Design a protein with these regions (language model features):
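Nucleotide-activated sugar donor-binding and catalytic core shared by glycosyltransferases
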Residues: 1-166
Length: 166
């Protein structure tokens, strides 16, 4: 069990403590960095700026902020978004960090609108659903009240090591 393997558990969220303590785990909540920098987004304003109606569905694709993430998980997220794009009332957006904007631009389908990082909170709030690489962004999107489908793809060496234990 987890209690046999660790002496003390560092939790990100307060709601984790009541789950772990009854199993004999001492817990300390350290918090999450996204909670300290949360800014409410204005989804209606983003929809107006982009010319979207209130009824159009917005799929927000967030393939990561690091080159390796974008290379590994990006294609799967874009493939899922393209399946959803068959509906005429769907718009696909992405927010690209400045450090990977060129890489994201080269990867996205032509119908995708690429937003500046300064619009991320508004995009998070405007989205009907987000398809996101696992990371801090999933918490940031969830704080805006938007459902998130989280994806992750291991590198082949990590996968091979993990597979040996499963």
């Amino acid at each position: 069990t987890l209690a046999a393997a660790v002496d003390h558990l560092i939790c990100i969220h307060d709601f984790e403590v009541p789950f772990y303590e009854p199993h004999g785990l001492a817990c300390t909540v350290c918090g999450h960095p996204a909670l300290g920098r949360y800014t409410p987004g204005d989804g209606a304003a983003l929809r107006a700026r982009q010319g979207f109606t209130p009824t159009e569905k917005i799929i927000l694709v967030l393939p990561g902020s690091r080159s390796a993430e974008i290379r590994r998980i990006g294609p799967a997220l874009w493939a899922a978004a393209e399946l959803l794009d068959r509906d005429r009332d769907v718009r696909i957006l992405t927010v690209a960090a400045n450090s990977v904007r060129e890489q994201v631009t080269a990867q996205v389908p032509a119908t995708v609108r690429i937003l500046d990082e300064s619009e991320k909170e508004d995009a998070f709030a405007a989205a009907t659903v987000a398809l996101a690489a696992s990371g801090t962004v999933t918490t940031e999107v969830a704080l805006q009240g938007t459902p998130v489908v989280v994806g992750y793809k291991l590198g082949w060496i990590t996968w091979a090591i993990a597979r040996a234990f499963l």
